[in-house]
Swiss-Prot record:
TM region positions: none
Modifications made to the protein after synthesis: Phosphorylated to form H2AS128ph (gamma-H2A) in response to DNA double-strand breaks (DSBs) generated by exogenous genotoxic agents and by stalled replication forks. Phosphorylation is dependent on the DNA damage checkpoint kinases mec1/ATR and tel1/ATM, spreads on either side of a detected DSB site and may mark the surrounding chromatin for recruitment of proteins required for DNA damage signaling and repair. Gamma-H2A is removed from the DNA prior to the strand invasion-primer extension step of the repair process and subsequently dephosphorylated.
Record protein name field: Histone H2A
InterPro entries attached to this UniProt entry: Histone-fold, Histone_H2A, Histone_H2A/H2B/H3, Histone_H2A_C, Histone_H2A_CS
Positions occupied by motif [ST]-Q motif: 128-129
Organism taxonomic ancestry: Eukaryota, Fungi, Dikarya, Ascomycota, Pezizomycotina
GO cellular component, one term: nucleosome
Keywords: Acetylation, Chromosome, DNA damage, DNA repair, DNA-binding, Methylation, Nucleosome core, Nucleus, Phosphoprotein
S-S pairs: none
N5-methylglutamine carried by residues: 106
Keyword DNA repair in annotation: yes
Subunit-level organization: The nucleosome is a histone octamer containing two molecules each of H2A, H2B, H3 and H4 assembled in one H3-H4 heterotetramer and two H2A-H2B heterodimers. The octamer wraps approximately 147 bp of DNA.
Site feature (Not ubiquitinated) residues: 120
Length: 131
């Protein structure tokens, strides 16, 4: 075969390592880079931008999943359902601000009864009213 095409990997890629593993991330840096290029956000995309964005997305996912796991444990469940995600996001001030206009399917609403709808508390007299 001429031209150096042996059908295998390139000679310099014996220790190939993904950009995600180089950055210590679980989210795919290569896929984020491809989506940034295809999304027409800018003409050019720097090398550090997809790494940073993947790290931010991974952090947000971990934060939401931790709070949702706590909500599931509070409800004595071992599986996170959309209701737990909804409770986690709406009870956290910053996440609620970030995802304020997001609708979560099968998420339900936060339990809340307006103060005016609650029964009035009657003060009890210390002395007995009976004769």
């Amino acid at each position: 075969m001429t031209g150096g095409k042996s059908g295998g990997k390139a000679s310099g890629s014996k220790n190939a390592q993904s950009r995600s593993s180089k950055a210590g991330l679980a989210f795919p840096v290569g896929r984020v880079h491809r989506l940034l290029r295809k999304g027409n956000y800018a003409q050019r995309v720097g090398a550090g931008a997809p790494v940073y964005l993947a790290a931010v997305l991974e952090y947000l996912a971990a934060e939401i999943l931790e709070l949702a796991g706590n909500a599931a444990r509070d409800n004595k469940k071992t599986r996170i359902i959309p209701r737990h995600l909804q409770l986690a996001i709406r009870n956290d001030e910053e996440l609620n601000k970030l995802l304020g206009h997001v609708t979560i399917a099968q998420g339900g609403v936060l339990p809340n009864i307006h103060q005016n709808l609650l029964p009035k508390k009657t003060p009890k007299a210390k002395g007995s009213q009976e004769l």
